[in-house]
Amino acid sequence: MARKKTITREHILAAVYEVVSTEGFSGFTARNIANKMKTSTQPIYLEFKNMDELRNVFIDRVTAGLRNEVYERRFTDDCIVDLTINYVKFASENSVFYKSLFVDNHESGEKLNKFSHDLFFEKVNSDEKYSKLSTEVKEAIFTNCWVMSVGLSSLAASKRANPTNEELEHMIKNMINMSIEHPDVTLTR
């Protein structure tokens, strides 16, 4: 009779979350994850063919959670302002995890950048206020607001700033207006 599996995919993903949210991706090793579960690395490799697959499954789980739980909260009538407020709140409430995902350099950085870009466009394309803007203007708004949001979030995560929702709304609306009026001026060019 085969032995019953005691460590499941969910256990492993929970251990990955603990490691990344306390140590960052620098701690993302089979040994560290196994140590969190107080086991050998064998269960990890029984569930995942390699660490790249585990990382991809983890990032997919994280982005689904961000999409469905974090970024769906509404504070204003503006989808871009709400994305920013949610991003800054997430950084403030989960500082190490935020830095691990969005600041530190790691193999999933491009995937997370694409997630942020795609989510922004999904929101603005379904919003009457923004949907008819040109792609150039939407890209300018995304770039400028994203750079500003990352800066604000980094300050919030390090407890150097604690902007209110109203302050965030005011700053982002100013950035949106500047981007609409001057789409050729972005913070990354």
Description of each model-found segment:
Residues 1-23, 32, 53-56:
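Basic, helix-initiating cap at the start of DNA-binding domains
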Residues 70-96, 135, 145, 189:
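Hydrophobic alpha-helical connector segments
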Residues 28-35, 44:
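Append "Primarily bacterial transcriptional regulators
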Residues 21-25, 38, 45-55:
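HTH DNA-binding helix-turn interface
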Residues 53-62, 70, 101, 105, ...:
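Alpha-helical DNA-contacting segments of helix-turn-helix folds
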Residues 105-144, 170-180:
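Amphipathic alpha-helical packing segments from all-alpha helical-bundle domains
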Residues 97-100, 146-164, 177-188:
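Amphipathic C-terminal alpha-helical segment
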Residues 56-83, 120-126:
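Amphipathic alpha-helical linker/stalk segments
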